[in-house]
Amino acid sequence: MGKIKKKGTSGQAKNYITRTQAVRKLQISLPDFRRLCIFKGIYPREPRSKKKASKTSTPNTTFYYTKDIQYLLHEPLLRKFRDQKAVAKKIARSLGRGEVGDAARLEKNHAPKLTLDHVIKERYPTFIDALRDLDDALSLLFLFANLPSDAHVPPKTIALCQRLCHEFQHYLITTNSLRKSFLSIKGIYYQATIQGQDIMWLVPYRFVQRVNGDVDYRIMATFVDFYTTLLGFVNFRLYSSIGLRYPPKFDTRSDENGAELAAFTLEGRAVGDVPKAIEAGHTQRSSSANKEVSRDIQAKVDKVIKSAGLDQAKDEQTAETTEESSDTIDKFEPAAPEADTLAQPDLSGSQAGSLFAPFTFYISREAPRAPLEFLLRAFGCKRIGWDAVLGDGAFTNDETDPRITHQIVDRPQLPESSLPAIPAAAEEDSGAVQKVKPGTRIPGRTYVQPQWVWDCINEGKLVRPDLYSPGATLPPHLSPWVKPSRGGYDPRASLAEQEEEGEAEMAEDSDEEMEEAADEKSKTASKDEAESESEEDDDDESVDGGMDVAGTDDDESESESEEEDEDFGGFEDDEAASESEDEEEVARTQHQKELEAEAAGLPFSSNGATSDASKKKASQAKKIAAKKRKEEEEIERQKMMMSRKKRKLLEKMMYSNKKQSEEAAKLRSKRRKLEKGAAK
C-alpha cells in the first residue's frame, strides 16, 4: 500500500512560494527583497490556481517560483544587505547616544557599497543580449537626466544619467547609427541600429517637470542603479569597438555653461593620438591613404596580368565586382497595384552620414536646440550655430554669418509693426555679435521649421523646404514605423488616389441634399416667424384685454356700406380660387412623383423632369450597386466551397477589413469637408 502524500509537498504548492515566505527564507527586509529581485530579474508569477498554490486557507496575491528563491540564496548581494543592516544599527545607536561624529564616520568609511558587475555578466552573457535589453534602460535614464533635483532624486544621480546619455549619443554621432525619429505627445522617439539590433527609446520634452508624490522613487532608483551600470558596460564596449578611449574627456566648466555634447572630447586608443573629436573626415583621410597604397600595388599587378595576356578576363571580373559593390539601396515596388506595400530597406551608415553634411545650420532661440543638434550631428552636419543664450559649443553665434545655409525657425509670421526694436549696442562693446531684428530674412538662406529635419531623416532624403517655411501649414508628421496598409487611410496621398469608385459623387449628392434640407428648414423657420409676427399685429389691434368696444350707429352704417361695396368683386375672386386649386393639384402630383422616385431609388428634380446629369449619376449608382452585389455573390459562392474553419477565418478577416474601410471612409469624409471649407 502506497504512502499517503502530505498536502503542500507536490504540484503547485511545491513549485510556488509566497512573498512572505521568500522574505523569511532569505532573512532580509521587504525593500531589500524588492531591490534584489529587480537586480536579478526575478518577477512575480501567476499560478493556475491560487488556492492550490497557497498552503493557507486564504489565497495570497503574490507568488514566486520556488527555484528562483532557492537561486537567490547563493547571491553575494545578500551579504552586502546584511552588512548594511548591521551598519545602520550602529549608526542609529551612535545617534541615540548623541555621537554625531561617530555616526558620520561609520556612514562614510564602513557603509558597504554594492557592485552590480557580476549581476550584469550573469544576466547578459553576450553583448547582443545587452543591446536587446537597452530600450528600457535608455528611456529611464533619459527621463532622469531631464528631472529636477529634489529630496527623492539627488543631483549626483541626474549628473550620472546625463553623462552616460551624452556618451551614448556621441557614439551614435561618430558611427552614424541613428536611423529614425518621431515627435509624439509623450516625447521624442529615436531608433538606432547597433550591430544589427534595432534600439528604440523615448526622450521627454524639456518642459518644467512637476514631481508627484504618488510615484515610488525607491523602486525607480533601484532600476536607475542597475541601468547605469548596464549602460556603462555597453558604452565601454561600443567605444572600444571603434577604437576610442572610454570614458571620454569631460570639461566641467563647459558643461556648466550649457555645452552638453560639446563638453566631451573623444580620443583614440593609439599611443600617438592627439585628443580630438573623431569625425567622418578623419576616417576619410585614412581611407584615402590606404587607397593610394592599394593603387600602387594594383598597378604592379596590372603589369603582370597584361604580360600574361589575362587583361580581358580581368576586365570582366572588375565589371562584375563594380556591379556587386554598388552601395545604392534597391527599392522594392509591388508588381500589381492591389498588392501589399513592401518594406523598404533603411539608410546605410554612409548615406546617413552625408544627409546634412554640406550644410551649415543656425538654430533660433525658440527652437529646441538639444534634439536638433543631436539629429543634425548624427546625420553628418559638422557646422551648427545658435545664439549665445542657448549655451556654449556653437560653430558660430553670429546670425548674420554668410556661411549659414539653413536656419531653423519656430516662430509665427508677425507684421513688422508689432515687432520690438533692437536696442543699440554700447560703444565700448565693440566685439558684440550683431543682432538681427526678428522676422528679418537674410538673402541666400533657407528658412525651415523644425519638422523639416525629422521628415528628411524619416524619408531618407531632403524634402522640399518650401512646404516647411515659417508660418506655413505643415504636412502631416507621421510615424515612420507605421506603414499605410491596403484599404487604410493615408494622409500623405490625395483623396482621388484613395477614394473608391463613385465615392466622391455620392458624397457630393449627400452634401447637396443636406444643404437643401437646411435651406428648407430656414425657409420654414422664417415663414413661421412671419406668421407669428402677423398674429401679434392682429392681437395688438384689440383693446382692453382683447375685448372690442361697441361702435356707434354711424360706424355701423359705414361698415355696412363698405361690406355692400366689397360683396361683389367681379370675376377676380373666382380666378384666385381656381388658381389656388391648381396649385394644390400641382403640389399633390409633385409629392406623388417624389414618392415614386424614392421607391425606385432615383433622384427627383423639382421641375418634374430628370436632367441628364442626374440620369448619369443614377446609372452610375446602379452600376456600382450591381458590381458590389456581384462581388458579394462571388464571395458567398466561394465560402460554400470552404471548410468551416477556413470560412470562420475568412469572416473574421472580412469583418476587420470592413471596420478598417469604414474608419478610412470617415477620415476621408472629414478631410473632404476640411478641404471644401478651405477652398471657400
UniProtKB/Swiss-Prot annotation:
The lineage of its organism: Eukaryota, Fungi, Dikarya, Ascomycota, Pezizomycotina. It is found in: Nucleus, Nucleolus; Nucleus, Nucleoplasm. Residues 351-470 form the BRCT domain. Residues 519-529, 586-596, 629-639 have a biased composition (Basic and acidic residues). Residues 310-330, 472-680 are annotated as: Disordered. This is Pescadillo homolog. Keywords: Coiled coil, Nucleus, Ribosome biogenesis, rRNA processing. GO terms for biological process: maturation of 5.8S rRNA from tricistronic rRNA transcript (SSU-rRNA, 5.8S rRNA, LSU-rRNA); maturation of LSU-rRNA from tricistronic rRNA transcript (SSU-rRNA, 5.8S rRNA, LSU-rRNA). Component of the NOP7 complex, composed of erb1, nop7 and ytm1. The complex is held together by erb1, which interacts with nop7 via its N-terminal domain and with ytm1 via a high-affinity interaction between the seven-bladed beta-propeller domains of the 2 proteins. The NOP7 complex associates with the 66S pre-ribosome. Residues 496-523, 613-680 form a coiled coil. Component of the NOP7 complex, which is required for maturation of the 25S and 5.8S ribosomal RNAs and formation of the 60S ribosome. Residues 616-628 have a biased composition (Basic residues). The keyword Coiled coil applies. GO terms for molecular function: ribonucleoprotein complex binding; RNA binding. One of its GO terms (cellular component) is preribosome, large subunit precursor. Residues 497-518, 530-543, 551-585 have a biased composition (Acidic residues). Belongs to the pescadillo family. Gene3D superfamilies: BRCT domain.
